[in-house]
């Protein structure tokens, strides 16, 4: 695992965010393919997406009539998601938020695309996953892979939003610490692996 030690407070980075995921055609196509695959393979009843942005991914589940919730800390972007019919809470994901949410409903699928590297407290993040996820559920996370970043010279993925750069060997003990395990690993061409 690699990490940046000079941290910018998350509220400064994400309080009023300017990146809208739906502006990237390649990312939207990737999200659509992933959503279809998750629906086919996992058949979820309730999907929670962490850092759901403008609802680009959850809108597929909404269109299929699948219960969903987006968690997006940037109010300006969360408002766009809500305006398009995506139920969205404007907060940073944490174990505390997960405990609040689980009192209403647990998730059998949690999606976290390009957010885990942003979390300054990975233990709190993973603890939140464990709390919110049903015992037979799945958490799917996409993030830049440190091995690809170094091996392919992808240093353009290094910036203040990304606090951590993970390897599989750094993730396994982190997940185990919270009684979770990695069951599948895939490399994708999106965002550095």
Enumerate the language-model features and the residues they cover.
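Extended interfacial segments that mediate partner engagement and assembly in macromolecular machines
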Residues: 1-80
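Hydrophobic adenine-recognition pocket in adenosine-nucleotide-binding enzymes
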Residues: 115
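A short glycine-rich, Lys/Arg-flanked "PGG" loop and its adjoining helix->strand segment in the class I
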Residues: 123-140
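Short, glycine-/aromatic-enriched active-site segment of Class I SAM-dependent methyltransferases
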Residues: 139-164, 168-170
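Glycine-rich phosphate-binding loop signature in dinucleotide/nucleotide-binding domains
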Residues: 42-43, 102-105
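Conserved SAM-binding strand-loop segment of SAM-dependent methyltransferases
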Residues: 85-100
């Amino acid at each position: 695992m690699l990490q940046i030690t000079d941290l910018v407070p998350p509220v400064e980075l994400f309080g009023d965010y300017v990146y809208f995921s739906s502006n990237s055609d390649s990312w939207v196509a990737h999200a659509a393919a992933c959503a279809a695959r998750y629906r086919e393979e996992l058949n979820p009843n309730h999907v929670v997406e962490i850092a759901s942005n403008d609802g680009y991914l959850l809108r597929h589940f909404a269109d299929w009539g699948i219960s969903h919730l987006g968690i997006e800390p940037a109010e300006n972007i969360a408002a766009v998601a809500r305006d398009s019919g995506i139920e969205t809470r404007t907060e940073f994901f944490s174990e505390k938020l997960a405990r609040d949410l689980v009192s209403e409903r647990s998730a059998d699928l949690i999606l976290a695309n390009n957010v885990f590297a942003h979390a300054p407290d990975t233990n709190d993040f993973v603890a939140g996953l464990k709390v919110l996820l049903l015992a037979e559920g799945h958490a799917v996370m996409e993030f830049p892979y440190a091995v690809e970043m170094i091996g392919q010279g992808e240093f353009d993925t290094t910036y203040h939003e990304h606090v951590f750069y993970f390897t599989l060997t750094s993730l396994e003990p982190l997940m185990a610490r919270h009684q979770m395990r990695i069951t599948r690993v895939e490399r994708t061409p999106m965002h550095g692996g």
